[in-house]
Amino acid sequence: MSQQQFKYIVRLFGQDVDGTMKLPYALAMIKGIGYNTAMIIIRKLNLDKDKRLGEISDEDIKKIENLLNNKIIPESPNWIYNRQKDYESGADMHLVTSDLIFYVRNDIERERRSRSWRGVRHSLGLKVRGQRTRTTGRTGATIGVRRAKAGQPQQQAKPAGPAEGGEAKK
């Protein structure tokens, strides 16, 4: 393949992806697609996993986009989908980029409105999945330790008198 045909930047799902990366890793750069999902997509479309993203044709890029624009990956296991049993439709879907962000934001907002435990934790900005919060996840300014000024000597303790339980004069 000549140098003119190699694309160093490839536009994929409205996002610029480095064309020098191998195909599975380049697809994994897109939000909503991980390495395993990328490998399933590559197998479905009979692409070479060792090729660079900049080496594949524009038709193959369109095939990849069309496969995920349908929000389903045909003949793939249910565990590969990143949105299983959708709240409104009940279908398994695989969302990418802004669709994924939109659905997750709507889920969080629905839980806040219903005042479920998860919604309350989200609205308070706390951890949701049962993690400990005593020491980790702290936000806000830290309060340091106050130190005495270096030039001032510390006050010496006075010897206790008779009223304070000290020795009486004779």
UniProtKB/Swiss-Prot annotation:
UniProt keyword annotation of Transcription regulation present: no
Any GO MF annotation of the entry: structural constituent of ribosome
Skewed-composition ranges (Low complexity): 133-162
Record PROSITE patterns: RIBOSOMAL_S13_1, RIBOSOMAL_S13_2
GO cellular component: cytosol; small ribosomal subunit
Disordered: region residues: 132-170
Listed Pfam families: Ribosomal_S13
One of the GO BP terms on file: translation
Annotated keywords: Ribonucleoprotein, Ribosomal protein, RNA-binding, rRNA-binding
Cited PANTHER family: 30S RIBOSOMAL PROTEIN S13/40S RIBOSOMAL PROTEIN S18, SMALL RIBOSOMAL SUBUNIT PROTEIN US13
Annotated HAMAP family: Ribosomal_uS13
Chain's role: Located at the top of the head of the 30S subunit, it contacts several helices of the 16S rRNA. In the 70S ribosome it contacts the 23S rRNA (bridge B1a) and protein L5 of the 50S subunit (bridge B1b), connecting the 2 subunits; these bridges are implicated in subunit movement.
Record-linked NCBIfam families: PRK04053.1, uS13_arch
Subunit structure and binding partners: Part of the 30S ribosomal subunit. Forms a loose heterodimer with protein S19. Forms two bridges to the 50S subunit in the 70S ribosome.
Protein known as: Small ribosomal subunit protein uS13
Organismal lineage: Archaea, Thermoproteota, Thermoprotei, Sulfolobales, Sulfolobaceae
